[in-house]
């Protein structure tokens, strides 16, 4: 015979399990939490989660004792999800969001507090986006400078991968938080992106309203892992989702120098054993981007490309615009049209990488392909985009390898200039360096005339930065073309080294184009470098 006490205890345990199960069944999506930032007007923010199929869900937005709005929906099967779109809100806060599920006589309530409305930016890419504030120049000062930016909120996605597209995140490294020295400087390549944080901080300085920053990055990853299968198929990328394509990560290695003093002329950095960053196609799109599709966004900033220097490099000019188009379509559809169809997409053009040999490791080509082979953005294949040139921000002494330069402040500053111009429509703002608008061969004088679209400052004249393609007997080779003279918007190259026909010209076509902020051509403010370019010569003077 069973005694009454154990039976009663078992019954209580069963009731407890049922109660907890019912509570767990009704929840917000993983990224809806205290301290979050929701997208402000003119878009409506999406609030969604999971519940019991057939139940009614009422979402209430409150400020203090005042009810701002209520939205009612139901839980849809078989996904067991519910979703509402809030009316567009002006920037500000704080607010409380309450969701109540009603099924027959049972009510369950969820609350999140200290919610702000502002602009939400998603930051993604590989290790240069993943680097934290702890790893950059002036880290101590940057980490102590958070008190004035409590309306810039941060969120970080866990490093997870999936074979199929997930509806919700499988893990969160850092829930929505106010910035602190602890969560910004948690460790190396963990928690919060330095570029993302600094970009948001610069935006806040300009806009003076809340900014939400979502970091979803993983070092040592090619673009294929961040792309949907549909996007890759559109570019003819072989489907290798069942294979692991090993990618080299970069680490520093001494080359006959016993110290880090400047007397050491150089160090070389060589690929080491592959790191944990996945290379199976689409697995990070599935696990770290697709689950965010219902989040209403202002835009995206991206820093990636190093791992494609020797992997599907020639397809990058197709894959990158396809990734942008795919993300835009998914986020627009996922939040019922609240995220703009062609939302602003900013990116960092690859920085420098110190090599011992003459090989360029594919960096010049990737920089070019990052612009869909146009040399600048926005362009017809990449509308509503902006780019931060970073090839002049080299860092030969970086403890993380020269491929990981520590000046992320300048990167973020240049990115925010692009955002102000492209995403926010600020007029009369110079946000990119000089671009050649006319290239003319002056045959009689053996000179090449480059006319730029803005005033230029030539910071150095050498015989390496500009090169010409010299053709003779059906063979062409690149030769140096020293700067002869220059004026406010014009630069003239000496072609005397070419005894044949000059067919093309290129600028800064190397992995390490210059020393820190010492490339040849800048805007007159000295803040924005001219991007690298290559061009055929079609105008020939007399």
From Swiss-Prot:
One GO MF term attached to the UniProt entry: sialate O-acetylesterase activity
Post-translational modifications: The two subunits are derived from a single precursor by proteolytic cleavage.
Tissues showing expression: Widely expressed.
This protein's UniProt keywords: Disulfide bond, Glycoprotein, Hydrolase, Lysosome, Serine esterase, Signal
Glycan-bearing residues: 107, 138, 188, 294, 357, 428, 449, 463
Regulation: Inhibited by diisopropyl fluorophosphate and diethyl-P-nitrophenyl phosphate.
Origin superkingdom: Eukaryota
Function of the protein: Catalyzes the removal of O-acetyl ester groups from position 9 of the free diacetylated sialate N-acetyl-9-O-acetylneuraminate (Neu5,9Ac2) in the cytosol and of the diacetylated sialate residues of sialylglycoconjugates in the lysosomes. Together with the sialate-O-acetyltransferase they regulate the balance of acetylated sialoglycoconjugates, key players in various processes such as cell-cell interactions, host-pathogen recognition, and tumor antigenicity.
Reactions catalysed according to its record: N-acetyl-9-O-acetylneuraminate + H2O = N-acetylneuraminate + acetate + H(+); an Ac-O-9-sialoglycoconjugate + H2O = a sialoglycoconjugate + acetate + H(+)
Subcellular location: Lysosome
Signal peptide: 1-23
Subunit architecture: Disulfide-linked heterodimer of a small subunit and a large subunit.
Species the sequence originates in: Rattus norvegicus
Known EC number: 3.1.1.53
Primary residence: other
GO cellular component: lysosome
Stated name of the protein: Sialate O-acetylesterase
Biological-process GO terms, alphabetical: carbohydrate metabolic process; regulation of immune system process
Taxonomic lineage from the root: Eukaryota, Metazoa, Chordata, Craniata, Vertebrata
């Amino acid at each position: 015979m069973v005694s009454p006490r154990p039976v009663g205890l078992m019954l209580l345990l069963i009731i407890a399990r049922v109660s907890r199960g019912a509570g767990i069944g009704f929840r917000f999506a993983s990224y809806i939490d205290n301290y979050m930032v929701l997208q402000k007007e003119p878009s409506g923010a999406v609030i969604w989660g999971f519940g019991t199929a057939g139940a009614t869900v009422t979402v209430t937005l409150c400020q203090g004792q005042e009810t701002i709005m209520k939205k009612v929906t139901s839980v849809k099967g078989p996904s067991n999800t519910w979703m509402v779109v809030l009316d567009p809100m002006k920037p500000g806060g704080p607010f409380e969001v309450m969701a109540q599920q009603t099924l027959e006589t049972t009510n369950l309530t969820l609350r999140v507090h200290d919610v702000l409305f502002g602009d939400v930016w998603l930051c993604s890419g590989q290790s240069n986006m993943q680097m934290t504030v702890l790893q950059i120049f002036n880290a101590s000062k940057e980490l102590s400078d958070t008190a004035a930016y409590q309306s810039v909120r941060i969120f970080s996605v866990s490093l997870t991968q999936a074979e199929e597209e997930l509806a919700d995140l499988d893990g969160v490294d850092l829930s929505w938080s106010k910035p602190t020295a602890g969560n910004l400087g948690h460790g190396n390549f963990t928690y919060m992106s330095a570029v993302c944080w600094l970009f948001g901080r610069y935006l806040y300085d300009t806009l003076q309203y809340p900014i939400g920053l979502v970091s979803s990055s993983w070092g040592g990853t090619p673009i294929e892992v961040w792309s949907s299968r549909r996007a890759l198929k559109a570019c003819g990328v072989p489907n290798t989702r069942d294979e692991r394509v090993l990618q080299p990560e970069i680490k520093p290695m001494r080359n006959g120098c016993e110290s880090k003093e400047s007397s050491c002329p150089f160090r070389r950095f060589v690929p080491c054993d592959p790191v944990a960053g996945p290379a199976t196609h689409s697995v990070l799109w599935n696990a770290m981007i697709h689950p965010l599709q219902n989040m209403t966004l202002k835009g995206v900033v991206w820093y990636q490309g190093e791992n494609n220097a020797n992997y599907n490099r020639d397809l990058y000019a197709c894959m990158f615009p396809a990734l942008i188009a795919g993300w835009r379509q998914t986020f627009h559809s996922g939040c019922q049209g609240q995220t703009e169809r062609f939302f602003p997409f900013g990116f960092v053009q690859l920085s420098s990488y110190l090599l011992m040999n003459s090989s360029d490791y594919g960096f010049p080509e990737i920089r070019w392909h990052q612009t869909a082979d146009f040399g600048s953005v926005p362009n017809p294949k990449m509308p509503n985009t902006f780019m931060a040139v970073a090839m002049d921000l080299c860092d030969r002494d970086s403890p993380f390898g020269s491929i990981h330069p520590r000046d992320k402040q300048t990167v973020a500053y240049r990115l925010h200039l692009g955002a102000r111009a492209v995403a926010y429509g600020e007029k009369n703002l110079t946000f990119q360096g000089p671009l050649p608008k006319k290239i003319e061969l002056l045959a009689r004088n053996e000179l090449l005339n480059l006319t730029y679209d803005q005033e230029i400052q030539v910071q150095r004249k050498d015989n390496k930065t500009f090169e010409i393609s010299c053709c003779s007997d059906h063979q062409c080779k690149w030769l140096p073309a020293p700067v002869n003279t220059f004026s406010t918007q014009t630069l003239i190259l000496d072609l005397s080294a070419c005894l044949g026909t000059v067919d093309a010209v290129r600028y800064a076509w190397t992995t390490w184009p210059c020393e820190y902020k010492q490339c040849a051509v800048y805007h007159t403010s000295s803040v924005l470098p001219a991007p690298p370019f290559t061009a055929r010569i079609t105008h020939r003077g007399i």
